[in-house]
Amino acid sequence: MKSAVLVFPGINRERDMARALRLVSGREPAMVWHAETSLPEGTDLVVAPGGFSYGDYLRCGAIAARAPVMDAVRAFASDGGLVLGVCNGFQILCESGLLPGILMRNARLKFICHDVHLRVERSDTPFTRGYNAGQVIRVPVAHGEGNYAADEDTIRRLEGEGRVLYRYCSASGEVGDTHNINGAAQSIAGIVNERGNVLGMMPHPENHVEDIMGCTDGRGLFAGLVAHLERAA
């Protein structure tokens, strides 16, 4: 799997993401600066990592979404290329029009930084084939604006089309207000576009891929992408 990690001013999770990709795929990802106008030839996966691009001024991800490299990312996605946005990367994908909705301030107006449980809603997508449907995984979050919101029609469409891939839940898989850490509509933690090749999620799977971290639940996302691309080759 040949991956490319986008680097914007203020991003601070690009090295975490690059390490996870390298450990799981066995290949060193390319680091692509925001001012670039093209992606490396042969790229299979583009990742927008977490952090605080441009200091989160205006709106989280709003300035990064207008960076030169994003035209190449939109074209890549339009051609069916796989795109993953994590945390600030999710915000960037929403601001760039690659995903619907927006990420608002957490309901309790506080920064959240701890492990959470997610329920995997489907296992038949490139981003979830490393898991079983209904499986509960544990991954970290670190955000102040992770409260996913969209109009009622968009939420209805996301649910009806099976485009919610990850949902906040309890350790046993229960979904509800008690386990909804940030107030996100329908406890949404991660969604895909209509075509299913662009995923945005607030939690950080890249931080749970090694035994030394005490949990490897995030590894399945990356292993699933590798398996999907190998099968498609």
From Swiss-Prot:
Pfam families given in the database record: GATase_5
Domain spans labelled Glutamine amidotransferase type-1: 3-233
NCBIfam families, per the entry: FGAM_synth_I (TIGR01737), PRK03619.1 (NF002957)
UniProt name for this protein: Phosphoribosylformylglycinamidine synthase subunit PurQ
Pathway: Purine metabolism; IMP biosynthesis via de novo pathway; 5-amino-1-(5-phospho-D-ribosyl)imidazole from N(2)-formyl-N(1)-(5-phospho-D-ribosyl)glycinamide: step 1/2
Record flagged with keyword Ligase: yes
Residues of the signal peptide: none
Listed SMART domains: GATase_5 (SM01211)
Entry GO MF terms: ATP binding; glutaminase activity; phosphoribosylformylglycinamidine synthase activity
Originating organism: Nitrobacter winogradskyi (strain ATCC 25391 / DSM 10237 / CIP 104748 / NCIMB 11846 / Nb-255)
Cellular component aspect of the GO annotation: cytoplasm
